Amino acid sequence: MEARNMTPFTYFSLPMQKLFLRNQAAVRNKPYAKYFRSEMRVPLSAVRKIQQGPMALEDTLTPSIEDINRLLEPDFVSEESGYALLPGPMAYVQSRKFFPGCTAQMFKWWFIWHPAESERYTLWFPYAHVSNPCVHHQRLRDESLSFEERLYGNTFCASEYVGDRLMHLHIDFQQPASLGLNTDLYREAKIDGSVSALMSLADHPEVPVSLMVHLFKEVPDGMYLTSRYWVGAHPSMARFPGAEKAASLLKENGFGEAELETLAYEFAVHDMCEFNHLASFLPDLYREFGTPAA
């Protein structure tokens, strides 16, 4: 199994500290309450990469079709963490997380199971997550459908803190090909699944302001999740209807260049915390509450 030096992550903004206490009280009588844990551990190597400051632009990817398909190239290995401000302006975040003892089935199950109750969502990031209901919840729970049929074309309505900013987002999960990933390359890369999406601000769901790519793949000792986030304006986002309005909408909501760079940093920290925390308990949670059909 991959050897990693994990370290406690201990700084959370005051609003997040207060949210933790509310979440702790809400989950107390749930059968899965023991998985609500205050300690969050992250790879020290990922922390150190983020501490180096914004990445050089030549080391980043844009949301263009050409660049996102680089994630599928046989010799491509993602960096563990990092963030930058791209021209546009656009916030950029990259990461690669290891889930020891986890399978693709466990990870898929999590995306079916957690939206049913807000308290389940809080297990994922107790200091940051509020709720994440699914628009088409009956389809999400329909065991006669495949995972892809249940998730793609479905929308999660996430409320969560990113840093000290409470964000209300619509996450519209899409087929990989709909986002620009090449079907042949995807198959050749032997990706076990994708939970990739377009994101919008909840009060403007018709304007995608973000492309989020999450690709997961099993390895002998667990699973790797490779992720990219792009938030903001970029010419290549024009392939998504409504994205041409993203720049003005974000500016109206207080996201200038400085704010987007801060958001990139905070998203990098958020991603590092939530997915490494999920990795710490998902196999045990699945063994207790998961079913093969889900």
Swiss-Prot record:
Chain positions recorded as Zn(2+) binding sites: 129, 160, 270, 274
Sorted UniProt keywords: Hydrolase, Metal-binding, Zinc
EC number: 3.7.1.24
Documented effect of changing residue 229 to A: 15-fold decrease in catalytic efficiency
Free-text note regarding domains: Contains a small N-terminal domain involved in dimerization and a large C-terminal Bet v1-like fold catalytic domain.
Subunit structure: Homodimer.
UniProt-recorded name of the protein: 2,4-diacetylphloroglucinol hydrolase
Lineage, highest ranks first: Bacteria, Pseudomonadati, Pseudomonadota, Gammaproteobacteria, Pseudomonadales
Gene: phlG
